[in-house]
């Protein structure tokens, strides 16, 4: 089974029902994959839900089918080594995926692979 890390922007696209939300939902419906998010993504979506007064029911429903991966000291050190003044969050997400045995990352960010310096497969929605 393929383990896929979902970048925060994919879940935000769904929660806010933005233009790519249907494509994101379709991509996340493959039963042959295990979907996961980083602890950082959980923080980001929870913060955005509070800020924009979104329903927490939707988040809780999402969390019931997603693994939540830890950000450890090893994750932070790996991300720090790769950071080149572009996007530390991308580096942290990629390092989290790599240290937790994910095979791919699903994102909306066209520059994710370039900024994160990951060797994992990166699937860009849209």
Q: Where does each model-flagged region fall?
A:
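Short, well-structured N-terminal submotif of metal-dependent ribonuclease cores
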Residues: 1-37, 49-57
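Acidic, PIN/NYN-like endoribonuclease modules and their adjacent C-terminal/linker elements
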Residues: 3, 95, 99-126
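A generic structural signal for short hydrophobic patches within well-formed alpha-helices
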Residues: 11-12, 42, 76, 112-113
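Short, flexible helix/strand-to-coil boundary loops that buttress conserved ligand/catalytic motifs
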Residues: 15-16, 49, 83, 116-119
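A general structural signal for well-ordered alpha-helical segments in protein cores
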Residues: 21, 38, 42, 56-59, ...
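Acidic catalytic patch
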Residues: 62-84
């Amino acid at each position: 089974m393929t383990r896929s890390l979902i970048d925060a922007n994919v879940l935000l696209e769904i929660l806010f029902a933005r233009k790519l939300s249907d494509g994101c939902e379709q991509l996340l419906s493959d039963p042959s994959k295990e979907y996961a998010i980083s602890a950082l993504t959980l923080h980001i979506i929870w913060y955005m839900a509070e800020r924009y007064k979104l329903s927490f029911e939707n988040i809780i429903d999402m969390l019931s089918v997603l693994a939540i991966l830890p950000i450890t000291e090893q994750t932070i050190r790996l991300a720090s080594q790769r950071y080149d003044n572009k996007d530390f969050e991308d580096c942290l997400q990629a390092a989290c995926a790599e240290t937790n045995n994910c095979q791919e990352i699903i994102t909306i960010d066209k520059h994710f692979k370039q900024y994160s310096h990951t060797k994992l497969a990166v699937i860009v929605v849209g």
